Every structure is written in structure tokens, then in C-alpha cells.
Amino acid sequence: MRLWLIRHGETQANIDGLYSGHAPTPLTARGIEQAQNLHTLLHGVSFDLVLCSELERAQHTARLVLSDRQLPVQIIPELNEMFFGDWEMRHHRDLMQEDAENYSAWCNDWQHAIPTNGEGFQAFSQRVERFIARLSEFQHYQNILVVSHQGVLSLLIARLIGMPAEAMWHFRVDQGCWSAIDINQKFATLRVLNSRAIGVENA
């Protein structure tokens, strides 16, 4: 089984450096172009299944990547980005002034401190682990497209290849690229990270 991983296209929140977990943040013109280019790059891959975050920026990306393919998109809430609570759509400079104590605590211990009224890393990582546990449901598929977010995909890669959850920051998943992980019964192999080449099955 191969997972083809795609991060949603660029949003204005990405440009502005805002925390955007669950807040609605539509794709920019560049984000749309990134997804359309991925449609071209991955046109030769025969996807059996599409799994996507329930957030619109990811779903829009999935629709553009699939384009004219008649493939249903299965919405998976576990693929949603981390929820930043009161910090949604806010810049770190503002949080340093307006929620200084909690934001400082989170910066110093992001694994245990929790964004104000948001989702802590422990809950977030457990949610991604639930998705990993579900992968056995899809083992009869060959090529699965997964459309999600930076945090989720970084954590997913780390955990699938046997690294601890806190190692997720070793993997930056860029927009406008595709990555691939092969999974067999014993282990997973990161085959490709952040490629802008034409995708080829079984390569």
C-alpha cells in the first residue's frame, strides 16, 4: 500500500503567518495553481481511494487534484489540522502581548502546554494515532491519496517510520508537492518527500 501525501494549497493565513487550525481559510490564487499543478503531476497515478481532512482548504485541494476523476472523497476528521482555540487566525506577535502567559508556556513546552481553549499536542497526536490504527481497513488498496495539513502529515510521517511524535518537526511538508510512503505488514518506508516531479506508480 502506498500513501500519496499532499498538503493543502497556500492560504492567506499561511502568507500572513497566522495560526490556522480549524478556521476557514480559502486557497489563494497561488494555492489553486499549486493544486492544479499536482493534478498534472499525479495524473498517471491510479488512485484507489482518497482520504481527506474535513476542512475546506484541504477538500478544495483534493477536488482540484482529482479534477475530472470520478473518485469519491472520504472525509476523515482525524486528518484535520491541530485546533488552536482562541489563537486561531492570530499572529504570534499579538499572542505574546494578549495571551502572554499561556503563549510563553506553550512555546517553552509545546508537548504539554495547551493553546487557550484549543487542542494540546497530546490530544492531537492521539487523534493522528487513531488514523494510523485505521489504515488496516484500507490495506487492500494499492494507491491512496491523503490530503491534509502540515502538522498532521509531519506527525504521520514520523510515526509511520517509527519515530516518536515529537520528532515530527524533522519533516517539513511543503505546499505544491507530493510525498509518498510505502506500507507493508512489517514497516513503512518514506519513498519520496516534497517532490515536484511526475508521480509514477511502483517507482
Curated annotation (Swiss-Prot):
Cellular component, GO annotation: cytoplasm
Alphabetic keyword roster: Cobalamin biosynthesis, Hydrolase
Reactions performed catalytically: adenosylcob(III)alamin 5'-phosphate + H2O = adenosylcob(III)alamin + phosphate; alpha-ribazole 5'-phosphate + H2O = alpha-ribazole + phosphate
Molecular function in Gene Ontology: alpha-ribazole phosphatase activity; phosphatase activity
EC nos: 3.1.3.73
Pfam families on file: His_Phos_1
Organism domain of life: Bacteria
Biochemical pathway: Nucleoside biosynthesis; alpha-ribazole biosynthesis; alpha-ribazole from 5,6-dimethylbenzimidazole: step 2/2
Top EC group: hydrolase
Active site: residue positions: 8, 81
InterPro entries hit by this protein: His_Pase_superF_clade-1, His_PPase_superfam, PG/BPGM_mutase_AS, PGM_Phosphatase, Ribazole_CobC
GO biological process: cobalamin biosynthetic process
Function: Catalyzes the conversion of adenosylcobalamin 5'-phosphate to adenosylcobalamin (vitamin B12); involved in the assembly of the nucleotide loop of cobalamin. Also catalyzes the hydrolysis of the phospho group from alpha-ribazole 5'-phosphate to form alpha-ribazole.
Family affiliation: Belongs to the phosphoglycerate mutase family.
Name of the featured protein: Adenosylcobalamin/alpha-ribazole phosphatase
Organism: Escherichia coli (strain K12)
